[in-house]
């Protein structure tokens, strides 16, 4: 199988030093910023509706995460996503705990109407977003990634690419599907690691607008491999976080491509 796109997508991302506009949750700001900086991207957190729609026009990509959702934040998210879509700026939706409350479900329905380029969630979130039965407990997924494959396909009517993250990540654009076997369980023991992945995917698709699915696959390989490298040294979640950032900083395109464990299903 040809994985030559990994190096080209990686280089495009690094060369662009993408400015990623993040409308993310309160818990995630620091980690999202640190991850993007370690990857040579530029983070921005501009939330207020008075300036966020204007600021996104200066950005290469937008990441929206509904983790700590309020009506005020939702209004800003909707206005900013609408602007991004109108300007052709790729944006990624992270529907955190969408199945937990009616407010989140309604918010995501509104956001889906603005046509995100990528949706990124765990299996339970993807199932709930597609209107299928899920077994989530808050932000934690109680479903397997395989159980969400059909839901991911259904959501391609709203987004160009759907990413389901879990033990084995899954990416679909409605025509091709990729399974990515990277990462480490320690990633679940540090808050906002998933939120930061959403931001990284946004940066990758912003730099690879004509190959968004491949860009998402590359981001997942890069991120998961960084976690694996970090756990060769780390002793627990604290040291993992430090070594994870260092690994993101150090990994090169050839490393990510040569170590990639990806299966393509056409």
UniProtKB/Swiss-Prot annotation:
Q: Where does ATP bind?
A: 120, 165
The record's annotation in InterPro entries points to: Hyethyz_kinase, Ribokinase-like
One GO molecular function term? ATP binding
Superkingdom to which the source organism belongs: Bacteria
Q: Name any cofactors this protein relies on.
A: Mg(2+)
One BP annotation, GO? thiamine biosynthetic process
- Which Pfam families does this entry report, sorted A to Z? HK
Q: Which CDD domains match?
A: THZ_kinase
Per its UniProt entry, what is the enzyme's top EC class, as one word? transferase
The identity of this protein, by name, is Hydroxyethylthiazole kinase
| UniProt organism field | Psychrobacter sp. (strain PRwf-1)
User: What taxonomic lineage is listed for the species of origin?
Assistant: Bacteria, Pseudomonadati, Pseudomonadota, Gammaproteobacteria, Moraxellales
The gene it comes from is: thiM
